[in-house]
Amino acid sequence: MDNDTLDFIAYSTVQPSICTSGLFRALVNRYTSIGYTLTRGIPYPISAPTNILYTETEIDAAIRHACDFSRRRRILNLWRASFSFALHLAQPTPDVITWTLFVWRDIFFHADPDRTEQHARELLNAVTIAVEMLPTHYGCLATLHYPPTVEQVLNGNISRLYPINYFGDQLLAQIGRARLEQAPAWLNVDVGLGRLIVPDLNAIYQGDTTTVQAANRYLFGDTLPLTTDGNGEIN
């Protein structure tokens, strides 16, 4: 978990790979269709002409780079208006691909403080599109608390609600669709083959609000996993 970013971390266990199947390219096309532009990731200024990827050749090359797990830095950057986010793929095991959709905290909180709620909605919209289009087993926005490990996800050992949560169809069956549907939340809807649960929109930028705590008590009682103190140290 990076203290410089807000990370939505998702786990895909469905084959073929989201890269070789063309699903990742389709996701990028969806983002560009609603006004996002791919950039080279140079932060200031994001909109500089030299930072924009204009041609299909440049975009295809950026996607191939993001899908090349032999490369250390595989980040795909997207931007529109006052909001930007990035996608990062990894393959922790032969059968699992993780994708992380993240935003830089300095841009999210400080670029324009009056737009923090708008940025939260932009982030949620980007996540919603991604979980709708990619075969996602589970996903969560890790802010104050560590996400579950790959092993915990594959074993269905989910014991916390985060500010944004996605449960794929297999987890819905394991945990119980009716139980998840009845969890108190600002947003609790079907997306793709799974369920998207956002206990409190404000929690995306405020952390553990009382609504998130209530939703956790409803689903999991008082037994919760380890947290961090904001500096990466385990409490």
Label the predicted regions.
Residues D2-D4, A10-I34, P147-N235:
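C-terminal interaction module
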Residues D4-I9, G41, P135-L141:
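Hydrophobic beta-strand segments of well-ordered beta-sheets in folded domains
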Residues T98-I164:
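Short helix-loop boundary/capping segments
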Residues A26-L38, M133-Y138:
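A common structural junction motif
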Residues L23-A26, R30, A62, E122, ...:
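Charge-rich, solvent-exposed alpha-helical interaction surfaces
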Residues I34-T98:
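Short, intrinsically disordered low-complexity segments
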Residues R80-D114, Q118, Q182-G207:
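Intrinsically disordered, low-complexity regulatory segments enriched in Ser/Thr/Pro
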